Amino acid sequence: MTFDPLSQDSPKDKKFPPSMVGLEIDSHGALLNGVLYIASGENPHPTMLLLHGIPGHERNTDLAHIFRRAGWNVVVFHYRGAWGSGGVYRFTHILEDIQVVLDYFRSPDIVARHRIDPEKVIVVGHSLGGWAALMTAANGFVDSAASIAGLNMGVWGQQLVESPELARSALRDTILDVGIAPLSGLDLDNEIADIIQNHLAWNPTQHGDALSKVNLLLVAAKRDTALPVFDHHFPLLEALKNSPSVKSALLDTDHSFSDSRIALAQTLLDWLRTV
């Protein structure tokens, strides 16, 4: 029996139905909270970490349900200091937290408990989460990753290096405008210092060799005013233009894909079939 996970419910499995469980995962002494959406069926499932941006108003849970119907386990969690997770919010912590969560879902007891295929654990991220997904892949922690309207942190860093005061003011406004109330302990001066210090290491275009070996999907939004494609998307495409494992899509929508959720889901579903 075939069905369309985009528009139809999955076939009923009374013995191994779809479900969800709350998560509390220790990361460097702080508890990360989140949810695991478990796909139906007895066999081990591929599993994705679905990473949100800053602060994380858009969590893409509509995508999580679609991907679960398509046979994927989906993890939606909050980084340290975000949305009630313990600890302090910092960009450096985000990358560390992702590694911790990947290790957690590859551990033998969790693999057995939640019917996970440990050889197929990937990352998919939106905005800041897209950058984090790319950096996680570049550092060799996954062999498949997708970035949705992904940030290039290196672009922010280069702007801070070249025009410190102007860029500092603009970046402060950008981060404050998205709303930082859900972020505990955020210190913009510390974040800006980290971005400057890591402006090359945190630029995905500097990791072309590593990313060219990854099964990669880059989805961008043509009308993205938060992270314009000419700064954050096209330069990375150019850096990876000779890699056959890199796929891309440009949708006519805004940063949150507000009027293109179905098109976004279909683009990702098509790519997931190649993972």
Where are these regions (language model features)?
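Alpha/beta-hydrolase active-site loop
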Residues: 89-115
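Hydrolase active-site cap/lid region
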Residues: 135-190
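Conserved alpha/beta-hydrolase
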Residues: 64-86
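Serine-hydrolase catalytic core
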Residues: 184-273
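Alpha/beta-hydrolase fold nucleophile elbow
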Residues: 111-127
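Short beta-strand element of the alpha/beta-hydrolase
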Residues: 44-53
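The serine-hydrolase catalytic nucleophile loop
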Residues: 53-66, 230
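N-terminal cap/lid segment of alpha/beta-hydrolase-fold proteins
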Residues: 1-42
